[in-house]
UniProtKB/Swiss-Prot annotation:
Lineage: Bacteria, Pseudomonadati, Pseudomonadota, Gammaproteobacteria, Enterobacterales
Keywords tagged on the record: Cytoplasm, DNA damage, DNA recombination, DNA repair, DNA-binding
Family from the record: Belongs to the RuvA family.
Name recorded for this polypeptide: Holliday junction branch migration complex subunit RuvA
GO molecular function, one term: four-way junction DNA binding
Length: 203
């Protein structure tokens, strides 16, 4: 079981990051809310991971702290919620925002996430509220919204295409992803900024 990785970021292709540890490159899937906090390629990062084995693949999911990983593991225990949907949920909302939505029973907020219908939202609220009660201490502490800079890099068209691809990977349909990005696109924004703003605008 791989529970934690510390290494150098080789590539960032939302929502994937390639992290080199002891000469081995690990491809890690991360929620966009965690991806935003990663340093730039070439710098060191620490991610807490959850290893998922499927018939057709072995996948690593990464998080910036143990609390986010705990929430992911609780999410995939919910009936009808697999790793891909859990990743989409935590990309559309931070861990704290999701906890707040569940505790306040905000069905309307949850159904705006890709792949979440009313029944799934109601199931999440019922099951996750019970699990939150069983967890000791404060599961999460509120974090201030991150202000992203836009370092020099790909062109605006490249950034938009990368943002659309990331949204599709998170469960949005291609046409919907294109529409979301085009509504908030601007020349000075990198792909991470576009993804963040598109997800925020969808909620």
């Amino acid at each position: 079981m791989i529970g934690r990785l510390r290494g150098i970021i080789l590539e960032k292709q939302p929502p994937l990051v390639l992290l080199e540890t002891a000469g081995v490159g690990y491809e890690v899937h991360m929620p966009m809310t965690c991806f935003y906090e990663l340093p730039e390629a070439g710098q060191e990062a620490i991610v807490f991971t959850h290893f998922v084995v499927r018939e057709d693949a072995q996948l690593l999911y990464g998080f910036n702290n143990k609390q986010e990983r705990t929430l992911f593991k609780e999410l995939i225990k919910t009936n009808g919620v697999g790793p891909k949907l859990a990743l989409a949920i935590l990309s559309g909302m931070s861990a704290q925002q999701f906890v707040n939505a569940v505790e306040r029973e905000e069905v309307a907020s949850l159904v705006k996430l890709p792949g979440i219908g009313k029944k799934t939202a109601e199931r999440l609220i019922v099951e996750m509220k019970d699990r939150f009660k069983g967890l000791h201490g404060d599961l999460f502490t509120p974090a201030a919204d991150l202000v992203l800079t836009s370092p020099a890099g790909p062109t605006a068209d490249d950034a938009e295409q990368e943002a659309v691809a990331a949204l599709v990977a998170l469960g949005y349909k291609p046409q919907e992803a294109s529409r979301m990005v085009s509504k908030i696109a601007r020349p000075d924004a990198n792909s991470e900024t576009l993804i963040r703003e598109a997800l925020r605008a969808a909620l």
